[in-house]
Amino acid sequence: MFVSLWEFFYGHFFRFWMKWLLRQMTGKCELQRIFDTYGGAQRTYRIENSLTYSKNKVLQNATRVAQSELDRCIANIMKEKNICSEKDTSFQICMRTCLLQITGYKQLYHDVENVRKKPYDSANAQHEKMLLKLWSLLMPTKKLTARISKQWADIGFQGDDPKTDFRGMGILGLINLVYFSENYTSEAHQILSRSNHPKLGYSYAIVGINLTEMAYSLLKSEALKLHLYNFVPGVPTMEHFHQFYCYLVYEFDKFWLEEEPESIMYFNLYREKFHERIKGLLMDCNAVLTLKT
């Protein structure tokens, strides 16, 4: 109740008068003051909040503007806020960077979601080719005897046909597994080998798909904003999402071995512990979580 009242008074009264007072004192609007004071993710995050909670429709709509309309949008913001480009020469550049990151994050979520919604289809030649590529990347010296085979368990799938394991994350789970195996082949082989440990082993592919779900949920909840705003000086793309996934795979393997779980039966418990650790790291305004090998 108290929190709700504070949010109401802050949003409707206190924030307005505080902004007005600061503008009178500095001669600059809130957006300009943010650019003068902050850098990196803090700058973009605060600009996003300022635009989102503004009562001005031009500013509100800026967080959803199409990239083709970016320059016009910035010109409209400057007009609304009486900002002279000759007096504040950096405003347009700074605002453009922030809006590319803000709108890019929203687009990235939609792109990831669209891929996630696509189910694995064994009748799709591209899907089948990708699955067989995963096998060849992880088991280069061992031939797969048949498409439906118990051999899939060697790389951590549950049944004879991996397609059933992709139901939750769709083709996104396979794309991530292939991306890590192709771009970090040595690390993938090492992790696969460790996943076969007699006591601390786990199902490599199943855990990989589970970590796709973790990366997706963090993106959806906007927990990845600070990381991506720090890491990408423009529009974040699927490539950056895959890179974050690789970080999770590498770090989870280290975490699992360090924790020495009693058995795989405790996977969900340790998975949640790892999840909380990652969320804590992502709350740091200087967060940049990249795989360092």
Curated annotation (Swiss-Prot):
An example Gene Ontology molecular-function term: GTPase activator activity
Keywords of the record: GTPase activation
Alphabetized InterPro entries for the sequence: ELMO_dom (IPR006816), ELMO_domain-containing (IPR050868)
Lineage: Eukaryota, Metazoa, Chordata, Craniata, Vertebrata
Pfam families, A to Z: ELMO_CED12 (PF04727)
Biological processes per GO annotation: regulation of defense response to virus
PROSITE patterns given in the database record: ELMO
Name recorded for this polypeptide: ELMO domain-containing protein 2
Function, in words: Acts as a GTPase-activating protein (GAP) toward guanine nucleotide exchange factors like ARL2, ARL3, ARF1 and ARF6, but not for GTPases outside the Arf family.
Organism (species): Mus musculus
Keyword Cell membrane included in the entry's annotation: no
Record-annotated ELMO domain positions: 126-282
